[in-house]
A protein has these predicted regions:
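Short loop/edge segments at beta-strand edges and connector loops
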Residues: 31, 84, 119-120, 168-170
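N-terminal Rossmann-like FAD-binding beta1-loop-alpha1 element of flavoenzymes
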Residues: 2-29
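Glycine-rich FAD pyrophosphate-binding loop
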Residues: 21-43
Length: 174
């Protein structure tokens, strides 16, 4: 008898299986495709967002910032390549600066580490090949990239080694 059934083994299903595999639970993952991360996850942009987009005070804001830090820890634990490259949101006209200011304020309220506004000069010094009409940027150094396929596969492999059943080519219809 199963304690937990997880439907889908993209990055969310694999992460759920990985975390649950550390408990004494009978867990199974049912994946419709013939491999892990074979649908939406493998086409993901690979960006681990810093957390300045969600509305402050929401669960999404809290989970975005916590999840970004947790992903870094899991990648290190599972030897998944992780590149903390930061992110820039550019303003190409003065009219766009208030939007960046709002994102900055969200980031501060959400606890995004190291987030800051950059002048045009600071932005171009950081990324000299940008369009010369840049007037400023929002910089979030905690943003990172990771191969979503490698990340999901590593978590699924550990989950299976820890006793989670993985059923591939097994769509759930109801």
């Amino acid at each position: 008898m199963l304690d937990v059934a997880i439907i889908g083994c993209g990055v969310i299903g694999a992460a759920s299986a990985y975390e649950l595999s550390h408990y004494r639970l009978q867990t199974a993952v049912f994946e419709a495709e013939n491999d892990v991360a074979d649908c939406t996850t493998k086409a993901n942009s690979a960006i681990l967002h810093a957390g300045y987009d969600p509305e402050p005070g929401t669960q999404m804001a809290r989970l975005n910032v916590e999840g970004s830090a947790l992903a870094k820890e899991i990648c290190a634990r599972l030897d998944v390549p992780y590149r903390q490259c930061g992110s820039l949101v550019l303003a190409l006209s003065p009219e766009e600066l208030p939007h960046l200011q709002k994102l900055y304020e969200n980031g501060i309220a959400n606890g995004v580490p190291g987030i800051r506004m950059l002048s045009a000069e600071e932005t171009l010094a950081m990324e000299p090949n940008l369009a010369p009409n840049v007037v400023g940027a929002l910089y979030a150094p905690s943003a990172a990239i990771v191969s979503p396929w490698d990340f999901a596969l590593a978590m699924a492999e550990v989950a299976v080694r820890n006793g989670v059943e993985l059923h591939r080519s097994c769509p759930v219809t109801h």
